């Protein structure tokens, strides 16, 4: 049972990895050394089996990493993913960030009327938006802005090239968007 728990915890921790101290707290083990021993046994057992990923240890932090044999396939998938277009929701959030930056996730959620955390994380991973600061408001939320990749993706040189959009009011509603078509920049290059 411990191996299943360790596998799940390493998976959930992703790039951060799982430390002996964290495992000790989760399993309520008597000592960090006993948790470390469990991790070492898990690593050895896992790496002796046939998997596309291996367990690596970096300064007492255990992480999953791909094996060298599948490197080319992983690289190909990453290339395919990078070429994929943004979803309509991602385009919408990128537009909101461009118009309202710096802006917090909660402000984006308020404007859209739906939770946007996954979309914001996708845009962060793709490098379209980035963290630009921390608001000096309760909770100190992270503020987001667009990156140079935003300009490349939407084929614009500055935010002044975006269509005029009347300001959003405090409820997140906006008055008029007659000449606003956030999706047009993507539609234009579909015929190319």
Swiss-Prot record:
Q: List the Pfam families hit by this protein, alphabetically.
A: SMC_ScpB
Q: Where is the protein situated, by its record's location annotation?
A: Cytoplasm
Keywords from the UniProt entry: Cell cycle, Cell division, Chromosome partition, Cytoplasm
Q: What is its main location?
A: cytoplasm
GO cellular component entries: cytoplasm
Q: Which SUPFAM superfamilies match?
A: Winged helix' DNA-binding domain
Listed InterPro entries: ScpB_csome_segregation, WH-like_DNA-bd_sf, WH_DNA-bd_sf
Q: Name one GO biological process term.
A: DNA replication
Could you give the subunit structure recorded for this chain? Homodimer. Homodimerization may be required to stabilize the binding of ScpA to the Smc head domains. Component of a cohesin-like complex composed of ScpA, ScpB and the Smc homodimer, in which ScpA and ScpB bind to the head domain of Smc. The presence of the three proteins is required for the association of the complex with DNA.
UniProt lists the family membership as follows: Belongs to the ScpB family.
Function comment: Participates in chromosomal partition during cell division. May act via the formation of a condensin-like complex containing Smc and ScpA that pull DNA away from mid-cell into both cell halves.
Q: What is this protein called?
A: Segregation and condensation protein B
What organism, scientifically named, is this protein from? Mycoplasma mobile (strain ATCC 43663 / 163K / NCTC 11711)
């Amino acid at each position: 049972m411990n191996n299943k728990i360790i596998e799940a915890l390493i998976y959930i921790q992703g790039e951060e990895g799982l430390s002996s101290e964290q495992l000790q707290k989760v399993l309520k083990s008597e000592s960090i050394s006993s948790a470390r021993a469990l991790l070492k046994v898990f690593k050895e057992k896992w790496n002796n089996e046939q998997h596309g990923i291996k367990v690596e240890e970096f300064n007492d932090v255990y992480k999953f990493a791909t094996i060298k044999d599948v490197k080319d396939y992983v690289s190909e998938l990453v290339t395919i993913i990078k070429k994929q277009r943004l979803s309509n929701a991602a385009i919408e959030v990128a537009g909101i960030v461009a118009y309202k930056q710096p802006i917090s996730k909660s402000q984006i959620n308020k404007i859209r009327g739906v939770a946007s955390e996954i979309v914001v994380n996708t845009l962060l991973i793709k490098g379209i938006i980035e963290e630009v600061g921390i608001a000096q408001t309760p909770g100190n939320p992270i503020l987001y802005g667009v990156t140079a990749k935003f300009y490349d993706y939407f084929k614009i040189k500055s935010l002044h090239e975006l269509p005029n959009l009347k300001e959003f009011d405090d409820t997140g509603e906006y008055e008029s968007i007659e000449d606003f078509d956030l999706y047009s920049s993507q539609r234009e290059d579909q015929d190319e």
